[in-house]
Regions:
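Helix-to-loop junctions at the C-terminal end of transmembrane segments
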Residues: 54-67, 256-268, 351
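Cytoplasmic helix-loop-helix junction between adjacent transmembrane helices
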Residues: 97-137
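Paired small-residue
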Residues: 81-84, 92-101, 294-302
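Conserved MFS/SLC helix-loop-helix module at the cytosolic interface between two early adjacent transmembrane helices
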Residues: 53-92
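A late C-terminal transmembrane helix in Major Facilitator Superfamily
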Residues: 320-356, 362-363
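Intracellular juxtamembrane helix-capping segments at the cytosolic ends
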Residues: 108-120, 308-322
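C-terminal transmembrane helical hairpin of 12-TM major facilitator-type secondary transporters
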Residues: 270-314
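Helix-breaking motifs and short loop linkers at transmembrane-helix boundaries and internal kinks
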Residues: 34, 66, 87-93, 104, ...
Length: 410
């Protein structure tokens, strides 16, 4: 696996740590900014909206520069957003910080996943994406608990200062180890490539795959966005125990992502069907027994194993239905974050009238639709397991697998 894939994973880790930090800092943020838990929950929604709307726009703007320049530009924007978050003294200032970091994170995800897919042979794209998305799982495994722990001991501001430092480190690794393609397209080629990238969005199977990703992620984030208050206020765990539980949840997501990444290329349809079905079952169990500590932890870990860990299989499905180009992957990331918007936003709206258990029930509804949305792809052998050669979207100057390496041009 090219070293650049692991560097991109480090970048994903940094982005995800910032994205998820709010979930572990809800009580401190609510007290400091003078708002309720539901308002802090909307910070997750704001981040997701910024990702969905601003991410593709930033990606389009960066199509005219080299991939490494695009990534470094994103790191600068992301760094500025985290500095704003660390120094925020009001809720509006924190909202502004979440908008800036959300836009940057989404563009990074799309460009990074696109590079991963083009760095390797088609038969191991799912595995490469899985390696990069280990940054997502490690962000949950290490980043979220560390942010929660630092926020509890040193104040929530310290968590965002730490993320700013991580951003500098990730940018340095990118500058040192990620290289540009051997040949970059000129302006006419960029226009041709953009036309080709937009054309694939007329494909029904791509649109269905995008919608399916929204439902899969929405099912998990309806619960995950409020996991800390659920564990403390319903399950009865103490504040010192929650970081350990979040660490266990992160370990479950890391394990699940490794397994899914290895199976995603040859068993895409089966992985998605089994994963979404299990996620539905675990959400039902969590909703019923959230107030009983041991079963609550078991079902929480189950959701960690099969929730957001479907990402490598989801990415392979989208790339087969569309293409491996940056815009397709960024739009896919936008549909994923649309699931975050729906899960966290509707969950926040339900809490005042129905309590903290309501977001889990909402997740069950999303999970039912997610299972149904996977079924049509099972009839298509190419989407299900890639049994016929992939047909890439024609584009002038597009890179072929293996054309990017440490020895490519700067």
């Amino acid at each position: 696996m090219p070293a650049a894939v692991y560097v991109l994973a480090a970048g994903v880790f940094t982005m995800v740590t910032s994205e998820f930090a709010v979930a572990g800092l809800m009580p401190q943020l609510a007290d400091s900014l003078g708002t309720g838990i539901e308002q802090i929950g909307y910070l997750v929604t704001v981040f997701a909206i910024a990702m969905t709307v601003g991410g593709p726009a930033l990606t389009l703007a960066l199509l005219r520069v080299t991939p490494r320049t695009a990534l470094l530009t994103i790191f600068v924007i992301f760094f500025a957003g985290n500095l704003l978050a660390a120094s925020a003294t009001s809720y509006p200032a924190m909202v502004a910080a979440r908008v800036v970091t959300g836009v940057a994170a989404q563009a990074f995800f799309g460009i990074a996943i696109s590079l991963c897919a083009r760095l390797v042979d088609p038969g191991i794209r799912g595995r490469a994406v899985g390696v990069a998305l280990n940054g997502l799982m490690l962000g949950t495994l290490l980043g979220l608990p560390l942010a929660t722990l630092i926020g509890g001991r040193l104040g929530w501001q310290a968590a965002f200062w730490g993320i700013a430092v991580l951003t500098v480190i990730a940018a340095g690794l990118t500058l040192a180890l990620v290289r540009n393609p051997v040949a970059e397209p000129d302006s006419a080629e960029v226009r041709t490539r953009l036309t080709g990238e937009l054309a694939v969005f007329r494909r029904p199977q791509l649109l269905l795959a995008l919608a399916s990703s929204t439902m899969i992620i929405g099912a998990t984030f309806a619960m995950f966005s409020f996991l800390t208050p659920i564990l403390t206020r319903i399950s009865g765990f103490g504040g010192d125990t929650v970081p350990l539980l979040l660490l266990a949840y992160g370990a479950a997501t890391l394990l699940g992502n490794i397994v899914v990444g290895r199976l995603a290329d040859r068993h895409t349809g089966g992985v998605l069907l089994i994963g979404t079905t299990l996620n539905l079952a675990f959400l039902v169990g969590f909703a019923l027994l959230a107030d009983v500590p041991l079963p609550a932890v078991v079902f929480m870990l189950g959701i960690g194993l099969v929730g957001i860990t479907m990402n490598p299989a989801m990415a392979v499905r989208v790339q087969r239905a569309g293409s491996t180009r940056p815009l397709v992957n960024t739009v896919h990331a936008s549909f994923i974050t649309l699931g975050v918007i729906l899960g966290s936003g509707l969950g926040s709206a339900l809490i005042p009238g129905h309590g903290l258990r309501a977001p889990i029930v909402l997740g069950i509804g999303f999970a039912v639709v997610a299972v149904i949305s996977v079924l049509p792809m099972l009839r298509n052998p190419h989407l299900r397991n890639g049994t016929r050669p992939e047909v890439e979207m024609p584009s002038v100057g597009s890179e072929q697998p293996g054309t990017m390496s440490a020895g490519a041009s700067n």
